[in-house]
Structures are given as C-alpha cells and as structure tokens.
Regions:
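Residue-level recognition of single "structural anchor" positions
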Residues: 2-318
Length: 318
C-alpha cells in the first residue's frame, strides 16, 4: 500500500516540477478547476514544500513513508510525522485549504482586494477567521527589500485617518497614523512600483529607513522642501522643490489617494499596528500589476516558505 502511495506521490511531484507555475491567469472558474478540493491543494503545498527533497526536522533523516491523508510524511528513523501544511502559513487552517487558496487568489488578483467581512460571507466562515488568514497572506506580501528602486523616484509622507481639528501641515502631535511613501517612475513618467513605511514622526531618523530599505543610492530622488530631506540628502541624490497642488508630484498623490480610498472604502478602519501589512498588500499588487498572470504562483510559494505564525504573533492590541 505504501509503495502505491509513494508511486502516486512521485507522479504528482514530477508533474508539478515540470510546470513553470501552478496557475496562470485571473479567471476564478479556471482557478477552481485547477484546485477542485482540499486534497489537491494539499498536494500542491506538499510538492512545493519538499521540492528540494525531504529532511526530518528532528533527526535530519531523508527517508520517509508517505501518508495520503493530509499529505503527511513520517520519518523512517524517528517516526516523526509532518503534514504538508506544518510550518507554513497554511498551518492551522481549519476552514478548508481550498477556501484559503481562493482567499489568497482574490487578494492578489483583484484590483482592490476584499475585506474580511466580504471574504467571510463569500466562503461561509467567521469574520475573525477570514481576518486572521488574510493577515497571514499580508505577511507573505512583505517586501524582500532586495530590489531597491532606481531611476526617477518621488518621496512624500501622508497621514491615514483624515484631518484633525487645528492640525495643519506636518503636525508632530497628530494622533493619525503617519506614512512615508516612495514611488519609482518609468522614463515617460508613469508609475512603475513603490513602497511605504509606517513612521513615528516626520524626522529624518524616522523617514530614512524607507530610503535605506527601498531606494538605490544612484536613484534621482525628488521631494518637497521638508527639512528632514535636507539631512537625508547627505547620503542620497535628492532634489527638493516646492509642492504645488495639482502641478507636481501628481503620480505620488495618485498613489496616496488610492491607498486612503482603499482603506476607507474596503477595510473601513485599520489599527496603526496593522497598517504596515495593508501597505505591503497594496504595493505587492501594484509592483506586480504587469505580471498578474503569475501573481498567485508567487504568493503561493511565499505562503509555503514563510514560517508559521500563530494568533498571538499577528494580533496587535492598540
């Protein structure tokens, strides 16, 4: 029996290994045909997780017995059993792996994502359950910080949460969440990609990590005349100019408007402690907008390779 299961698993793996991606496109009906049930989804997870070979987490043994139920593998030496989802961001999903796949698909392939309330109604789960898994997907969307922006880059800051009475300009004591944002433009001035960091205040110390993490020292950076950028200009090529509404920084203001509108109309309210995840989600989609056909393949691999995170590691009480 185990021999037959091993042969079946080897066949599935060889078929998976020969594929350039597990799914291409944005058609939800075709997506469901590719992943028709929980078992097929677990098989794809197992083959991605162990694509470079199996190694027992306890004793490093490389031989195993395969169990089709939950796609488990049992070490032949210490008998440690490990499921396909163990140690991944799919770990602990009890509402159905296929539903989890569909939620991840919608978060990546739709233009504006969806709210946890919408996902809960659509897939017959609680809002709390959908929110928790969607936060896991957002963790997987975090930038690798390996590909700094080059060429023409615009940088600015904004607040999330609307205006406060008596607050004008950059108010350090504002209770609203503050964000520093950078956008790379194409040669003809169109938006290419971008990143954003939640910041504590508008000081150079708070803003500079955005430069260090996401902008090349060779980039031609344009900012407004805020004093913090004068300090950062000591190590980056920055040109400062006065911000004139409707005249300059149009691309940056377009991005800021989209982020604020998305949070207000789709998410309704986002706590400051979770805001970075929503920014990561927005720019994950934006930065791959010309590669939409392969975007699920990318997020799937990230969900499998990212270490498991539990409820206490994700929830922020603020």
């Amino acid at each position: 029996m185990n021999r037959l299961i091993y042969i079946k698993n080897t066949y599935i793996y060889s078929k998976y290994k020969d594929m350039e991606s597990i799914f291409q496109g944005e058609n939800i009906l075709e997506f469901i045909k590719t992943f028709p049930d929980d078992q097929s989804c677990r098989e794809f997870i197992a083959n991605e997780k162990w694509k470079n070979g199996y190694k027992c987490k306890r004793c490093d043994n490389t031989k195993y017995v395969y169990f089709e139920i939950h796609n488990k593998r049992e070490c032949t030496k210490c008998r440690y059993k490990e499921s396909a989802t163990a140690g991944t961001l799919f770990h602990g999903v009890k509402f159905g792996i296929q539903k989890a796949f569909c939620i991840a698909f919608e978060m990546t392939c739709t233009t504006k994502s969806l709210s946890s309330t919408q996902a809960a109604k659509r897939y017959g789960i609680t809002q709390k359950t959908s929110w928790f898994f969607m936060q896991k997907v957002r963790l997987a969307m975090k930038s690798s910080k390996k590909f700094p922006m080059k060429g023409n880059v615009q940088v600015d800051e904004f607040v999330v949460g609307g205006k406060e009475t008596g607050k004008q300009g950059r108010s350090y004591d504002s209770k609203k969440s503050k964000v520093a944002c950078a956008v790379e433009l194409t040669d003809d001035g169109k938006i290419k990609r971008g990143y954003a960091n939640v910041i504590d205040d508008y000081s150079a110390k708070s803003i500079k990590p955005l430069f260090d993490e996401h902008i090349s020292k060779d980039a031609n950076i344009k900012t407004d005349q805020w004093t913090a950028y004068k300090i950062i200009a000591k190590t980056y090529k920055i040109t400062q100019e006065k911000s004139i509404p409707g005249k300059n920084f149009k691309e940056m203001h377009t991005i800021i408007h989209q982020i604020k509108t998305g949070i207000r109309t789709i998410q309704s309210h986002v706590k400051k402690g979770h805001l970075q995840k929503y920014l990561d989600e927005y720019f994950y989609r934006l930065n791959r907008s010309i590669y939409k056909d392969a975007i699920f393949d990318n997020i799937f691999k990230r969900l499998v390779s990212h270490p498991h995170r539990g409820w206490k590691q994700i929830v922020v009480i603020k």
